[in-house]
Amino acid sequence: MSNIIIVINGPNLNMLGKREPGIYGGKTLKDIENDCVNAGADLGFSVEFRQSNHEGVLVDWLHEAGERAAGVVINPGAYSHTSIALHDAIRAISTPVVEVHISNIHAREEFRHKSMVSPAAKGMICGFGPYGYVMALHALKNITA
């Protein structure tokens, strides 16, 4: 079995550290990547960390993960609330997917309360800040053990 975990980040997450630090905190996406790589290594995973602002690229990465990864952590950003394409891409693969959000989407604007991705994912972690990514890695370790 593969030990690869692909961490996929959607639109605007490249702006972490600058964008609304009161909501998302001060960590950059690179900081979160470092946390994931280190935590993943401790769990026996090789973590590949990616970000794109383009929905089709995220779909392609999910398809790729279905071919070669043990699991996926995805923060779809705003696509969570609109993307049937991401929902369908997750349903198309057997690789377990954990959805992550830095903020608690249920405590924010009403349009953020519903995720189109969640029904297709194994589970969702939200509201724990950047540590949610590490939590997702631990969940995948449990799921894939």
Curated annotation (Swiss-Prot):
* Pathway(s) per entry: Metabolic intermediate biosynthesis; chorismate biosynthesis; chorismate from D-erythrose 4-phosphate and phosphoenolpyruvate: step 3/7
Instruction: List the PROSITE patterns.
Output: DEHYDROQUINASE_II
An MF annotation (GO) of this entry: 3-dehydroquinate dehydratase activity
* E.C. designation(s): 4.2.1.10
Q: What class of enzyme is it?
A: lyase
Record key words, sorted: Amino-acid biosynthesis, Aromatic amino acid biosynthesis, Lyase
TM spans, by residue?
A: none
Q: Which reaction does it catalyse?
A: 3-dehydroquinate = 3-dehydroshikimate + H2O
List the catalytic residues.
Y24 (proton acceptor), H101 (proton donor)
Q: Which residues bind substrate?
A: N75, H81, D88, I102, S103, R112
**Alphabetical list of Pfam families matching this protein:** DHquinase_II
The Gene Ontology biological process annotation of the record reads:
amino acid biosynthetic process; aromatic amino acid family biosynthetic process; chorismate biosynthetic process; quinate catabolic process
Lyase among keywords:
yes
Q: Record's family?
A: Belongs to the type-II 3-dehydroquinase family.
Note the NCBIfam families from the entry.
Answer: aroQ, PRK05395.1-2, PRK05395.1-3, PRK05395.1-4
What this protein is reported to do is described as: Catalyzes a trans-dehydration via an enolate intermediate.
User: Subunit structure of this entry?
Assistant: Homododecamer.
Record HAMAP family = AroQ
* Protein name (database record): 3-dehydroquinate dehydratase 1
Give the originating organism. Answer: Agrobacterium fabrum (strain C58 / ATCC 33970) (Agrobacterium tumefaciens (strain C58))
Lineage in the entry? Bacteria, Pseudomonadati, Pseudomonadota, Alphaproteobacteria, Hyphomicrobiales
